[in-house]
Amino acid sequence: EVIALIGPNGTGKSTIGRILAGLLKEKSGEVVLFGKHCRPKDRLGKVWYIPQDLDSQLFGEDLLDELTTGVEVSPERKKAAEEILEALELMSFVKQHPSTLSGGQKQRLALGVALMHEAPIIILDEPTSGLDGTNMRNVSRMISKLAKMGRTIIVITHDAECALACCERAIRLENGCITDDFQIRGAELLLDKIGYDKKEG
């Protein structure tokens, strides 16, 4: 399933994403994953958080190195990394330094890293921010592809177009609280829910 966590800036979307990933500790309440209460350290690796600022997360010398950083490298794992790059349409850039990729390609590479670590839940924070139309469509297509591979994807966004492009369900936040939780069946429903002006947009 691909879920959009939507709402204006400052409503706590990124904070919730970081809490789910175990990067921040909740001040109250509890996080339940797979039917069990999970402490922050228990969520690490199960929930993979991809931040908006990807450059601060790129450490590899090339794309293959980026995917295998932090995992035990074996011939099987190297082959798995190559297959992921192929699936994400990045194999032709395998020898390039990650910093030389476009914004959309970096997003796809970050998805590949999450796949290498076998995280069942992937959170993307504003994955299409700053991307042109072509790259936005490419990233959205890859997100949908990953969902079909059995991953749960949470897309944090304030962009209705991004949510419509790849998400099946939307959860709307306002002032840190959930105000709506609904299936996306078409543009009219989502745009009406978030108060998006269709004539202007």
Placement of each model-derived feature along the sequence:
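The feature captures the beta-strand-to-loop junction immediately N-terminal to the Walker
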Residues: I6-P8
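Helix-to-loop junction immediately C-terminal to a conserved catalytic motif
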Residues: A21
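Conserved ABC transporter NBD signature motif
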Residues: G29-R43
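Conserved ABC ATPase "signature" region
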Residues: E76-F93
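Conserved ABC ATPase signature
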Residues: H97-L101
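Catalytic Walker B motif of ABC-type/P-loop ATPase nucleotide-binding domains
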Residues: I122-D125
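H-loop/switch region of ABC-family ATPase nucleotide-binding domains
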Residues: T157-H158
